[in-house]
Amino acid sequence: MEIETGRMRITERDKECVRFVVEQGFATIEQLWKVAWSDQKNSSYTYNRVLSLEKFGFLKSVKINDTTMKIVTSTPKARIITAESSAYPTPVQGVSKDLVHHQLHLNELRILFQEKGLKDWRSAECLAVDPTFRKLGSRHVPDAFYISSRG
């Protein structure tokens, strides 16, 4: 299903990309390429799609002093579109810029796990707003958890 917003057609891959950023907090172009467009020869197509998603208010660039990579985060508009199609509660706020490097490393783990067939990754941000998770009685929210192919 594609969604028209203004003059941009939001594709399933765009939504997958936006959902990843909403759930993880931040992502690099290279990571989004692995998530949604890895069948493309290189990440230049991803870069152009991300620029369009920025232009139409779904993503925004984040300036981090000690990195040269382009890093994006989600906007309220992105969180709304993700919440409409998510089976789980969606984070209502972004992640603190203090956690960018930590989140980028977690992204690499998530991508690796997904490539190995693991599914249903739930980030700390998603777990923190999920009332069913809080009922488990844990005092600490883990960085993430996932469900293996064996359940």
Region spans (language model):
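Short, charged N-terminal helix-start/capping segments
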Residues: R79-S86, N107, I111-E115, K119
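A short, highly charged nucleic-acid-interacting micro-segment common to nuclease
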Residues: T90-L106
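Nuclease-adjacent, charged terminal/linker segments that flank catalytic cores
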Residues: M1-Q93
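Long, contiguous hydrophobic alpha-helical segments, chiefly transmembrane helices and signal peptides
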Residues: C17, V21, V72, H105-L106, ...
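Active-site metal-binding core of divalent-cation-utilizing nuclease and nuclease-like domains
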Residues: V62, H101, R110-G151
